[in-house]
């Protein structure tokens, strides 16, 4: 578990035991092994999350009490040394099959991808934004991808944003008033899409840092970075202006 201010990340690292049929490359047995590891990790993280929510803390092995009363946001993360192609990014299918609860969708990622994402992130807020968007139930339905890094780089470019259901938002936040026609239209116009490759810039940057043996690279390619929103850019600029004015 990692706690930063009022956000907690519950991390379950799973070794994936592959059956003999999976080791031969059969797709269906392999997918079942991967799905089983993900659901088991999600169940373990879910139990800890429930305990934190109910008790506002955890009893550690040495008997001491870890106070987590200030934690307001909890995310489950299931990692593995093994690659999880086609399963790690298919949360919606696991939810639809009843293998994952829709209210506790973990972020499922291989340690290799997690290491690359850690290198790409410039600010903690970028990482938190990605985990929030990545585990949003409707986002797992609207954005279908094979590669985790394609989803991550899509956040850098477009935000991986899904319009919320205005009817649900109105019920949960009545002060917003009745749903506007434009909000309902935008919500209904959303359609699922396949996320294609977004890793060209990442590949160029990574291979310029780690060229194959015997090759030399003159310049390091630019690292992919999150495109700042106009509002954030404007706010940063105004703060810098005030700072320069004393």
Which residue ranges define each predicted feature?
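Short conserved micro-motifs at the rims of enzyme active sites and ligand-binding pockets
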Residues: 12, 22-23, 87-92
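Active-site beta-strand-loop-beta-strand hairpin of nuclease catalytic cores
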Residues: 3-10, 14-20
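Catalytic cores of nucleic-acid endonucleases
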Residues: 15-66, 71, 76
């Amino acid at each position: 578990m990692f706690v930063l201010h009022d956000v907690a990340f519950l991390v379950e690292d799973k070794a994936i035991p592959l059956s003999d049929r999976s080791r031969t490359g059969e797709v269906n047995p392999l997918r079942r092994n991967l799905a089983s590891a993900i659901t088991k990790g999600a169940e373990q993280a879910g139990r800890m999350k429930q305990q934190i929510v109910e008790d506002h803390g955890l009893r550690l092995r040495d008997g001491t009490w870890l106070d987590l009363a200030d934690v307001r946001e909890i995310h489950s993360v299931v990692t593995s040394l093994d690659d999880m192609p086609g399963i790690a990014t298919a949360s919606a299918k696991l939810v639809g099959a009843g293998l994952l609860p829709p209210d506790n969708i973990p972020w499922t990622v291989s340690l290799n991808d997690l290491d690359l994402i850690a290198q790409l992130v410039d600010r903690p807020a970028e990482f938190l934004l990605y985990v929030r968007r990545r585990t949003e139930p409707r986002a797992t339905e609207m954005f279908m991808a094979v590669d985790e890094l394609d989803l991550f780089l899509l956040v850098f470019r477009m935000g991986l944003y899904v319009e919320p259901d205005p009817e649900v938002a109105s019920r949960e936040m009545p002060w917003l008033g009745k749903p506007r026609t434009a909000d309902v239209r935008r919500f209904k116009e959303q359609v699922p899409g396949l996320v294609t490759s977004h890793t060209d810039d990442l590949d160029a940057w990574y291979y310029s840092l780690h060229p194959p043996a015997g090759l030399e690279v003159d310049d390091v390619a630019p690292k992919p970075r999150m495109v700042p929103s106009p509002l954030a850019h404007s706010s940063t600029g105004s703060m810098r202006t005030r700072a320069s004015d004393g």
